[in-house]
Amino acid sequence: MKFFIFTCLLAVALAKHNMEHRSSSEDSVNISQEKFKQEKYVVIPTSKESICSTSCEEATRNINEMESAKFPTEVYSSSSSSEESAKFPTEREEKEVEEKHHLKQLNKINQFYEKLNFLQYLQALRQPRIVLTPWDQTKTGASPFIPIVNTEQLFTSEEIPKKTVDMESTEVVTEKTELTEEEKNYLKLLNKINQYYEKFTLPQYFKIVHQHQTTMDPQSHSKTNSYQIIPVLRYF
């Protein structure tokens, strides 16, 4: 117990000594700092020229500091403007390249269609050329359409009512007389048409024969019958 009490007392004494030493060192530091500050604030008598030079130097330093502070912003703005100006030419160049590519594609398409049109033109030239004449523009065959009149049917249609007339039925007789008048008018018109076509049968025949000799092209391989069908009017 005595040993333990002795050690505690020693520890307390050492701690007090350390605390006193630290406080003395701190006091000395504070005193030295106060002395340094007093030396700083001591006014040294100088002339007017030295005061002006120091003030001018301070002003120049302030100006330089302000300029140095502004310079990075100017550099940044100039760099940003240069980057923007570099971007615009690249976009223009890309647009020009796209337009050139588009024009090349259009030229290729035009050349392709020109070749197709030229091939179609050659095919049209190789096809047989058939010359159309005013006589066969609306007909597939070269023979004109001429009506044929059978006079047998007309005469029989006149004879049948005469045989079947009843003297007792007056109404039927009146109706048949009216029909016969219409038939007579119809027969007269048909006779006129036959007479008209009889005049033009021979010249038409010669024209058709001449057309079949000259219409076909020698390059064509298709063959047509040169014989012509001539209408015939039968009278009995």
From Swiss-Prot:
Q: Where is this region: Disordered?
A: 72-93
> Which GO molecular function terms does the record list?
protein homodimerization activity; zymogen binding
Q: Name one GO cellular component term.
A: extracellular space
What subcellular locations does the record give? Secreted
Q: Where are the transmembrane segments?
A: none
Q: What does this protein do?
A: Important role in the capacity of milk to transport calcium phosphate.
Q: What is this protein called?
A: Alpha-S2-casein
What organism does the record attribute this protein to?
Equus asinus
Q: Which gene encodes it?
A: CSN1S2
